[in-house]
């Protein structure tokens, strides 16, 4: 993956954790997540689709204002290997999000990309790299993505803390009420174990 500027974890010899959130739509849990990050002075990356920028512009601006990375999760959440047949279609999935972000914030979107559903091919990775992106996968994810079927607070916290390791990239979903409720405690417990939270490298 290195040849395509793609990675799924950070430095495995450093007690560092990278928080990342995928944002497909807003259901009221992102602001409590931002509140917890602010209270505990922890940075994160938010991978947003085009629809999210359209429908939650003030939250996106808050992410930027509070020092987080807002990065690209495509415009329509397509499986990117399925659109490699057309360079124009493929590129537009990323550049449309860049344009929306620039129009909203006046800033260039950071060149980090998370492929929808984690799906990729050698060709899609190469095409993403050609646009100047690093592709960011993850070393941990769990079943937090169904709002109507959320893990309990105990299950969510235990699942995350039991799987921490040096260089962890955590994939969490911002639609998860469990994540919003436990995030502050997770940050505190991780720090007690010697971890610190950094922005993506």
What is the role of each PLM region?
Residues 17-20, 44-48, 69-72, 111-115, ...:
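Structural recognition of the beta-strand scaffold that forms the well-ordered cores
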Residues 90-96, 127:
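Soluble catalytic domains of enzymes that build or remodel membrane lipids, polysaccharides, and related
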Residues 119, 125-163, 195-201:
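His/Asp/Glu-enriched short active-site or ligand-binding loop at hydrolase and phosphoryl-transfer sites
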